[in-house]
């Protein structure tokens, strides 16, 4: 009914949170629906050693049940997820080491992760949340699959909010495919989406 009525909320904490973790959060940002209908949200949690970790949680039954496997990279938070090929998820993470984004991919919903070639190299950041979305060829004028990314394009301070496009699956983010929206201070979190 287009959001006029809603079911009662379902508490999924016991399904996904290890009791030894200090907390578990989604995002911030948005989740995705994969081509096969799987719902996926980026997550962050602080483990029993008080170290933050980013990963994903997913549901194959329209949100009735949820699962988490392994984190993608330790000392990371505030991630965004995109399906870059059918069944392949890319997790783009705030890295508390600073300077640049950490990026990993998984083909098995986070049971195993592979560091992406662009990780800690291609996207600078000031230790801040960022946004990542996949835009299919049918939905853009270039007629090719692209990734869009937004963040404060600096290594210190939250300014120069920029949107970047990658035409090669996130390997490169060339200057000619970037638009700076505002160079002023005060820009931090952003969330890209398709409507």
Regions found by a protein language model. Give the residues of each.
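Asp-box/BNR beta-propeller blade signature and adjacent active/binding-site loops
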Residues: 1-195
């Amino acid at each position: 009914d287009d959001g006029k009525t809603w079911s009662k909320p379902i508490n999924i904490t016991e399904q996904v949170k290890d009791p030894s973790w200090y907390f578990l959060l989604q995002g911030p940002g948005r989740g995705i629906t994969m081509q096969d209908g799987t719902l996926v949200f980026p997550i962050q949690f602080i483990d029993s050693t008080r170290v933050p970790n980013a990963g994903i949680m997913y549901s194959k039954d329209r949100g009735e049940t949820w699962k988490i496997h392994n984190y993608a990279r330790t000392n990371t938070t505030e991630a965004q997820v995109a399906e870059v090929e059918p069944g392949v998820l890319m997790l783009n993470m705030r890295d508390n080491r600073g300077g640049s984004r950490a990026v990993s991919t998984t083909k098995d919903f986070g049971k195993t992760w592979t560091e992406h070639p662009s990780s800690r190299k291609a996207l600078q950041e000031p230790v801040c949340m960022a946004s990542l979305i996949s835009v299919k060829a049918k939905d853009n004028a270039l007629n090719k699959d692209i990734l869009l990314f937004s963040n404060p394009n600096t290594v210190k301070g939250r300014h120069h909010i920029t949107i970047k496009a990658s035409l090669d699956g996130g390997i490169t983010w060339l200057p000619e495919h970037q638009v700076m929206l505002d160079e002023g201070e005060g820009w931090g979190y952003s969330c890209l989406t398709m409507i």
